Amino acid sequence: MLKMGVVLFIVLVLFPLATLQLDADQPVERYAENKRLLNPDERRGIILHALGQRVCCPFGGCHELCYCCDG
């Protein structure tokens, strides 16, 4: 009877806890994979935007991640 209680405890409590930890890791891996797919210019723009910095736009093509420079 005690052995059956131990087996039930493992199956009903410990096994679901182990699987929940694995599920929690998946969004982080997916986020990292999406970041690797960005080209370097997009990645740089995202980082500069997060830091609150802006750079000059190339060839006068101004948008929200940069500002127009007179030079």
From Swiss-Prot:
Positions of the propeptide removed during maturation: 25-54
Cysteines engaged in disulfide bonds, as pairs: C56-C68, C57-C66, C62-C69
Pfam families from the UniProt entry: Conotoxin (PF02950)
- Which GO molecular-function terms appear in the entry? ion channel inhibitor activity; toxin activity
Q: In which tissues is it expressed?
A: Expressed by the venom duct.
Instruction: Please report the PTM annotation for this entry.
Output: Has been found to be amidated by Han et al. (2006), and to be unmodified by Ju et al. (2022). Ju et al. (2022) describe a disulfide connectivity (C56-C62; C57-C68; C66-C69) that differs from that of Han and colleagues (2006 and 2007).
Q: What is its main location?
A: secreted
**Sites bearing Aspartic acid 1-amide, chain numbering:** D70
The record's GO CC annotations read: extracellular region
Would the keyword Signal be found if you checked this record's keyword annotation?
A: yes
Which residues constitute the signal peptide according to the record? 1-24
Compartments, record wording? Secreted
UniProt cross-references to InterPro entries, sorted A to Z:
Conotoxin
Enumerate the UniProt keywords alphabetically: Amidation, Disulfide bond, Neurotoxin, Secreted, Signal, Toxin
> Is Disulfide bond tagged as a keyword?
yes
Q: What is known of its domains?
A: The cysteine framework is III (CC-C-C-CC). Classified in the M-1 branch, since 1 residue stands between the fourth and the fifth cysteine residues.
What else the UniProt entry mentions is: Negative results: Shows a very weak inhibition on Nav1.4 and Nav1.8 sodium channels. Intracranial injection into mice does not elicit symptoms.
| Family statement drawn from the similarity comment of this UniProt entry | Belongs to the conotoxin M superfamily.
Name of the protein? Conotoxin mr3e
